[in-house]
């Protein structure tokens, strides 16, 4: 689940995205201040638009909204008050974590891409990376699937030149860190970081 709020740009509407849906598949139902968006073919709920959001919630963010247990409980209460008989169950595990690059191999179909195996604590992800400085043995910042980058980009499972990739190894610039270097390259962490630790920025 991802949530977005931009009062000046969109109006007083909280946008909640659960999964992608094409325009051709798009269906919706209005329940009071809530519009439920669903896939017409599968009938799966793909998101909600909550109008007059500030009358229900205090949202300080402008753009992606940080998810928490309290926020999810509040959204479920809003759905319930507006007659939507659904309860959101959300993975609140950190989406930006420390990763350890266990291996790096040349991409079979692209000279400037590398295929990396990255340990992120509870699992090892295969991530295709285009940074020239990525290497085995580094500790890096990984945006896992479901992460929302400062730019608004949502990280999804992808296939890059025929090779599956689950997540992104981040640069300081992509993380919008102050004093990020101009040259292209991932952020390599120094110090006592452990794979799987949440990365705070």
From Swiss-Prot:
Which residues are the signal sequence here?
A: none
Q: Which SUPFAM superfamilies does this UniProt record tie to the protein?
A: Nucleic acid-binding proteins (SSF50249)
Show the CDD domains listed in the entry: tRNA_bind_bactPheRS
Q: Which InterPro entries match?
A: DUF4479 (IPR027855), NA-bd_OB-fold (IPR012340), tRNA-bd_dom (IPR002547), tRNA_bind_bactPheRS (IPR033714), YtpR-like_sf (IPR037154)
Q: Which PROSITE patterns match?
A: TRBD
Highest taxon above the source species: Bacteria
Q: Which Pfam families match?
A: DUF4479, tRNA_bind
Q: Which GO terms describe its molecular function?
A: tRNA binding
* UniProt-recorded name of the protein: Putative tRNA-binding protein YtpR
Organism, by scientific name, is Bacillus subtilis (strain 168)
What's the encoding gene here? ytpR
